[in-house]
Amino acid sequence: MKLQLIAVGTKMPDWVTRGFEEYQRRFPRDMALELIEIPAGKRGKNADIARILQKEGDLMLAAVAKGNHIVSLDLPGKNWTTPELAEQLSKWQLDGRDVSLLIGGPEGLSPACKEAASQSWCLSALTLPHPLVRVLVAESLYRAWSINNNHPYHRE
């Protein structure tokens, strides 16, 4: 199974890249974590945010492999505990499809991305910077995997 993290933004700070790659490399080959970066639209004083969101959303959805299960990361989504995320990960594996997780930019996800998602995950009720979300999602997914595989990484 492949977990695709499709995220708006390129040229992240080094600590974001290192943090994401740290968890990415821990996954076994049969549970690969892949990052696809979508260029962020240019935001300025008079930027048309709705148009930018639409373009970013179109690019994100174009990056989703056909047949993938789509999960949006969005505030109205389900707030899973770590054991609940582990259960979700097991369900996704049993489903047999790869999973695409969509992380929006500063203004979030386009309406098209939200509509295309069959699930929505609220990582936190806090407002988080989107670069940090990459690292948190990678760590959370690795922790969920470790629970499902009786790996000592997660401790109760």
Curated annotation (Swiss-Prot):
Q: Which domain of life is it from?
A: Bacteria
Q: Which organism is it from?
A: Shewanella denitrificans (strain OS217 / ATCC BAA-1090 / DSM 15013)
Q: Where in the cell is it found?
A: Cytoplasm
**What protein family is recorded?**
Belongs to the RNA methyltransferase RlmH family.
Which leading EC class covers this enzyme? transferase
Enzyme Commission number(s) from the entry: 2.1.1.177
Q: Name one GO cellular component term.
A: cytoplasm
Query: Know the name of this protein?
Result: Ribosomal RNA large subunit methyltransferase H
Binding site residues for S-adenosyl-L-methionine: L73, G104, L123, S124, A125, L126, T127, L128
Which one Pfam family would you cite for this protein?
Answer: SPOUT_MTase
Its catalytic activity? pseudouridine(1915) in 23S rRNA + S-adenosyl-L-methionine = N(3)-methylpseudouridine(1915) in 23S rRNA + S-adenosyl-L-homocysteine + H(+)
Functional note: Specifically methylates the pseudouridine at position 1915 (m3Psi1915) in 23S rRNA.
- Could you give the subunit structure recorded for this chain? Homodimer.
Chief localisation class: cytoplasm
Q: Which GO terms describe its molecular function?
A: rRNA (pseudouridine-N3-)-methyltransferase activity
Keyword terms of this UniProt record: Cytoplasm, Methyltransferase, rRNA processing, S-adenosyl-L-methionine, Transferase
